Amino acid sequence: MMTDEQRQHAVAVIQQALPTLEWILQPAKIKRLSRDFHWFSPLLTEQLAGKQADAVVRPRDEQELRQLVAACAQHQLPLTLRGSATGNYGQLVPLEGGLLVDMTGLNQIVALGNGTVRAQAGILLADIETAARPTGWELRCMPSTYRLASLGGLYGGGFGGIGSINYGPLAAPGNVLSVKVMTVEPVPRVLTIPAPEALLLHHAYGTNGIILEVELALAPVHQWIERLDVFDDFADALNYANACVRSPGLVKRQVALLATPIADYFSHLKDRYRTGQHAVISLIAEESEGLCASLLQRHRGSNAIRQASDEARTQNASLMEYCWNHTTLHALKVDNTLTYLQTAFDPLRYPQQILQMEQHFAGEVISHIEFLRDSEGNLTASGLQLVRYTTPARLNAIMQIFRDNDVKINNPHVLQVEDGKQGVIRPDVVAVKQSLDPAGLLNPGKLRGWALRDQLELDSNPLALATRETPTT
């Protein structure tokens, strides 16, 4: 690891060599840009205190990025990629200083048509939707932060979100078609990597390659109706949500279940329903919505909010921004002692597990359930439960109780890629880093397998399907 003085000297030399790049050197701005939403976790807040870059650079195009990467490789200076900083695990927070590379200048759609889109990593997901919807297509899955989140950030640090009820997470087969990457070498190479190899760089926090472009398959566009329905009984709300999920003819984009008092944290909405009610937020295609009334009656619910999604989005009032980890954000604005979990239920018995865990914790853990298909296509549920936080020991005990009841934990309170995924070290992901970032300069400290690479059996050619772009002179 470089000393502070060595890093600062390298930054000064690179800045002097590349003065036309957009450099951000003011300490307050560097500190702000070195942050994401890891403050959702009291554990990460403590672990990442004081961690930041030495400087921030915002390349305007691929050529400027190439010059910057080459200089970092020559000087062995760490670099970490930044999208829009909507991640929750400190993905972009530099552990060893160096340069923070703001990718938002690379924000163009490269190709759009025939149900696919290829775009640069720094583009906002909302801008892809805006361009695609008039052509009859929309994103298959996107986070609730779609207005702010970048494509590269979703690819490097995200999972799925709105639309995953149909298409599964981003990593499900068929969603990602290819990625274009740049290596971190004194003479950087540019490669196009088709799926499935492309997924070796997905959710790796930008540790094993620089994502330049992502090619995605799109979904047919629908006119969506956003609904918030309320229930006095949690089991009724769960059964209504599950009935929506398991009705194949009900065209939907999103179904979320929120136990009380979560809906009470929605300060802009809560005058539309009674305090203490459970809620289900859904996006239902206009042509399918007629089914909701009978389902709602059967499960003793009532509708509190109904709005056209297109109109709501133009007013920045979409219910999509009350789902996924936006739910956590709204809750923390009201009660900053809360934190959250990430859980994955069993596709064969998720309704029973959800009810069991809601009853077991009796308000200490508050059910926030997102319904989706898993990567194998099974209808299932994931949780982003809110937790009334007391101590690290109790938080870990709560997570163990879920595990003991056959509910998987994807731990959002840890820094390293593998520790959020049940601790599994993947030699293929490490092999890609060795191929694309041989000096280990990308986001150092986040990929635990890199420190253990000498103990792993690594494929010397992990990207056999990749094609190299011929450099232009």
Task: Give the ranges of each region predicted by the language model.
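N-terminal flexible segment immediately upstream of the FAD-binding catalytic core
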Residues: M1-A70, T86-G115, I262-K270, T314-D335, ...
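Short amphipathic alpha-helices in soluble, non-transmembrane regions
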Residues: I14, C72, Y240-R246, S288-S302, ...
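General beta-strand structural signal in soluble alpha/beta enzymes
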Residues: W23-P27, R58-P59, L79-G83, V101-M103, ...
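Short beta-strand-to-loop capping motifs
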Residues: R60, D229-D233, I281-E287, Q342-L348, ...
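Conserved glycine-rich FAD pyrophosphate-binding loop
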Residues: L77, S84, Q91-G98, T104, ...
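FAD-binding subdomain of flavoenzyme oxidoreductases
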Residues: V110, L125-A126, T130-G249, D459-A466, ...
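Glycine-rich, acidic
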Residues: N239-L269, A304-W324
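A conserved active-site cap/scaffold subdomain adjacent to cofactor or substrate pockets
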Residues: P261-Q307
